[in-house]
Amino acid sequence: MVEVQASLAPFINQEFVVTGAWGEPRSGHIHAGIDLASLGTGSNAQPIYSMSDGIVTRVDQTDQGTGYGAMCIIWNQNNNDLWLYGDLGDNSIPLTVGQTVQQGQQVGVEGNPAGTASTGLHVHLEKENQSDGIFKFGYNNSIDPTTGTGILNEVYTSSDEYYIYDGTPIPPSAEEKKGFNWPVFTKVIRERNNMGGFLLWKKRKWKN
C-alpha cells in the first residue's frame, strides 16, 4: 500500500480509505457522496471533523428514514458549499442547528447504520453548492466531494493508496480573500487538545 497526504479530509492524523465512490451505481440510485473509513482501528469509531467553516443547518442524531443515518449539514456562506456528514454514530453529533462551526471542529464519529449499503464503520460525505443554503439531496444536485482534497474518487483495494491528513488548512484562494472576514491560519500551535483529535490553530483575518 502507498500512503498519500491528503490536503483536506474529515479525518485528522488518522489513516483512512475510500470504501464507496461518488457516482457509483447503487440499488435504485447513484451514490451521491463518497464513503471514507478509518484504517486499522477495528471496532473503534474515529472522530469526524468539519472540512470547512460554516453554519449548521440540520442535525439528525439518529436515522430519520432518509437513508443517511445520523447526519449533519454545514453551510459555508462564503462560497455556498454545503457539506453533509452522514452515517455517523447515533447521538454522536455535538452540534445544534444554527451553531457556527470552524474547519477542524468535531462533528461526530464514524457509524455503521443498519439498513444502509454499509461497508462497516465509515462516514458518508456529500457536497452541494446552493446559494439558498438548502441541501437538495440526490446525485443530480451533488458535486464531487473529493475535488481539491487530494483524495481519489476510487474505491480502495489492498494494493491501493490510503490517505492521511494532518490538519493543515488549505490557504484561501485569491477569490476567497476578497470575501468578508476570511480567516487564515498563520501559526500552528503544536499541542493536541484533550479530545485526542486535532491541532489547535491561531487565527487572524485577511486584509482586503
PLM regions with names:
Residues 2-14, 40-42, 93-102, 124-187, ...:
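Acidic, glycine-rich catalytic/binding loops that coordinate metals and/or anionic ligands
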